Amino acid sequence: MNEQQALKKMIPPSKRREGAFLGGIIQIHVTRACDKACFGCTQGSNLGGKTGMIPLDLFEQAVISLKNYFGVVGIFGGNPALHPKFSDLCKILIKHIPFERRGLWCNNPKGNGWVMRETFNPRVSNLNVHLDKEAYDEFKRDWPESHPFGLDKDSRHSPVYVAMKDVIGDESERWRLISQCDVNQKWSAMIGVFRGELRAWFCEIAGAQSIIHQWDNEYPDTGVMVDENWWKLPMQEFSSQAKKHCHDCGVPLRGYGSLAQDESGIEQVSATHAEVYQLKRPDRAIQLVQLRSEVSEQSLKSFVSYIQNSEK
C-alpha cells in the first residue's frame, strides 16, 4: 500500500468515529506531568525532563477553536488535575463549551473533585485510577456522579515508542498497518503546546511525539495552526504529520507490552526515540528493540482495549 491509498482509509478530526463519545473526541493537552509513571504511557508521563503547563490564553484559544466541533472536548494529560490553574481552565471551558460536550481524562482528582463535578459530563469522561483506591474513593466522594474505573483491573499498555520504521524496512507494509491504526480509527486528535506555540495534530500520539521531542532543535514542527477551522481539514492536509509520526509510532504493531502498574514490567523503545526516552523511575528495566518480533506483534486484538488486554 502507498501513502495516498493509506490516507484515503484514515480518519481526519472532522469525521465521526464509530463508538466514540458523541461521535468524536478532540483532546486539549494541558500537561505531561502526572502522579503516576505507567509503563508505555502514550503521552510520555513515564518519562523525566521538563513537563510544561499550558498557559491560560493558549488554552482559551484551543477551546474557542472547538466551539463548533460536534463531539467531546477533552481535557487531557498527564494528570490535568496537577495543572496549578486547573480551576481556571475549568472556568474557561464552561464559558465556551456546553456541559454535554465537556470531558475529562484523569487518574486522580488531587483535591479538585468539586470543580470537576461542576465542569465535566461524567458520561463522556475517562477516569482510570490505575489500581489507586485513594483516588477512586476521592472521585466517588467529591464527584458522586463520576464513573472511575481501573480499581480492580490494571491496563495493558502496548509499546508506543517502538517506531515501525526501526523494525519494518518495507514502507508499503508500514502504510498498510498505518491505514488500520486503532488510535486513528477509534481515538482522538489533539491540541497542545509545541515550543511555546499552540499546535494541532490529527492524532494524539503525533502530538505526544512532538511534545516529547520539542527540545531537539532539528525536530520538525508538524502541527497545524489552531483556528476555528483546523479540525475541518481533510486528511490530505495532515499528510506531513502522517509521513513523520505514523512511521515513528508502534501502535499498529499491537505489541504485547506491560501492565501499567507492573513493578516487574519492561519498557520498550527503539532507536528513533531512545535518546528522549529517559524514565522518570530509573530503577525500571528498559529494552532497546531492534527486531519486529521483540514486541510480540499482533498479540492484542485492539491497542485501545487496554482494560480487556490486561487479561491476556
Where are the regions a protein language model picked out?
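Short, charged low-complexity linear segments at domain edges
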Residues: 3-23, 144, 149-163, 207-232
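Conserved AdoMet/S-adenosylmethionine-binding subsite of the radical SAM
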Residues: 63-64, 68, 82-211
